[in-house]
Swiss-Prot record:
PANTHER family, alphabetized: UTP--GLUCOSE-1-PHOSPHATE URIDYLYLTRANSFERASE
Protein name: UTP--glucose-1-phosphate uridylyltransferase
InterPro entries assigned to the protein according to its UniProt record, in alphabetical order: GalF (IPR005774), GalU_uridylyltTrfase_bac/arc (IPR005771), NTP_transferase_dom (IPR005835), Nucleotide-diphossugar_trans (IPR029044)
EC number: 2.7.7.9
This protein's pathway: Carbohydrate metabolism; nucleotide-sugar metabolism; Bacterial outer membrane biogenesis; lipopolysaccharide biosynthesis
Enzyme class label: transferase
Keywords, ordered alphabetically: Lipopolysaccharide biosynthesis, Nucleotidyltransferase, Transferase
Amino acid sequence: MTNLKAVIPVAGLGMHMLPATKAIPKEMLPIVDKPMIQYIVDEIVAAGIKEILLVTHASKNAVENHFDTSYELESLLEQRVKRQLLAEVQSICPPGVTIMNVRQGEPLGLGHSILCARPAIGDNPFVVVLPDVVIDDASADPLRYNLAAMIARFNETGRSQVLAKRMPGDLSEYSVIQTKEPLDREGKVSRIVEFIEKPDQPQTLDSDIMAVGRYVLSADIWPELERTQPGAWGRIQLTDAIAELAKKQSVDAMLMTGDSYDCGKKMGYMQAFVKYGLRNLKEGAKFRKGIEKLLSE
């Protein structure tokens, strides 16, 4: 079994969520009572990963601080006998989990962001989890499905894995996947035959499958990333490097189990907030009544 490190690229500017993200990192926008990035880290830890690398930017100090120990806050909560809150704060970075930071000096794309993590990862396989996409942990057990299943399959086959989902409609802003066999049920795996970042003419592709922002990558991706030239939007794209790797060896796409929300965009963020708000143990029932009242007006 391979001990994998996870990379979370958090250096993006969050332009789809402006003006909220002008001074606040999009990864720190709350979904009820936890910032978006916390859901991502919880998913990674549930999949069995103990070392996490945040690729950050000078404007993202709040993300780094979130995972640092706040001795003053913990002391205050202890003095005031706020044991539940203290436990929640201390669980932000669970025992045995290490969260490190590296900087991406220039916004040159997701592929470049991953390359910034190479000195900390070495010539080893690794995991990439995009912080925009939150997978609903109530719709799929993170101990068994999606990222956990991808890691298990990678350990079994040695092949790189890409999580995918069906997305009927306009795919021009997504990474579109074509597979050898149809992905017609949750958890099904098929070899990737084409992988295109933000296609100019998505209607010409016989596919409604997009990448979900979860990757388990073999060490063979490093040379491909080094050779990748700027692509869509003038950025070095991880998708382009994976597409080149798929020409040389099998790369699998796995159809996601459960539901996900693109929280890097307003609609996905609002949907996630409502979904998590409705099942919040403390306030969910009141929240539901409030929404029902608003809808009835």
